[in-house]
Each structure stands twice: as C-alpha cells, then as structure tokens.
C-alpha cells in the first residue's frame, strides 16, 4: 500500500502521464484523466482509445509519471493495467466520473473568474465512448533533484 502523503499527492492531480509500449518496443506516452485512487489501484480514463489502448491490449504493463512541483521530486509508478470497458465495475464508475467532471468544471469556472484565467472551454466534457484503465500499482520510484532514486514495491 502506498503511503498517505503519496496518495494525497496523486489524488490532488487531475491528469497523469501514462507510458505504454507495443510488442516491437515502440513507446507511447499520453496524459490520462485521473478518476480515483482505491487501495493499490489507480483508475484512469482513456477517452481517445488510440495507441495507449492498443498497446495495453497486447502488453498490459505501463509506467505513470508526474512531478511534485513544490518539492521537485518526480514519481514513477509501474504496474499492470486492466482495461475495464463493460460490466458492473464499468457502470459503477460512470457516476463517479460524472461527479468528478462536474467538480472539475466548477473549479475551472471559479478559477477563470477569480484569477482572470482564460480557458477555451471551462466545462470538461466526457465523450460517450471511453474506457477505464485500472492500474495495479506494483512499484513506486521516487526521483529526487539530487539524482537519487528510491524504489519501493507496493
């Protein structure tokens, strides 16, 4: 299980970069919408259904990355991905996704008004077709600005 500080750092993010690879070794990295953290699982939304989706169908290993801009510590989360595109679990996250979509849209509107930020689109739209990427966290790598790495099995 990941520690509380890392969990909170992940939960504060809206998007996270996911890297995948096809069987010939061709890499692909793309931002994914972070839906939730539950136990040792991250739930991401893939609404493009392109190379990431294709890669994960044949090679379900992925690496996620992000940086804490306050500490400049980078994180890499490695694990196995299950594509959830039907069934009770899929239907169960639809409500959570709709709620998060509303919260994010409200936040963007408030920021736009109070900070004078301009957004081309304040509302976050979730397309009709999407899949959930359920990532089982297996390893967390912490990369410090000093160049030191700390690897931990989850």
What are these regions (language model features)?
Residues 13-16, 40-41, 59-62, 130-132:
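Short, surface-exposed beta-edge/turn micro-motifs
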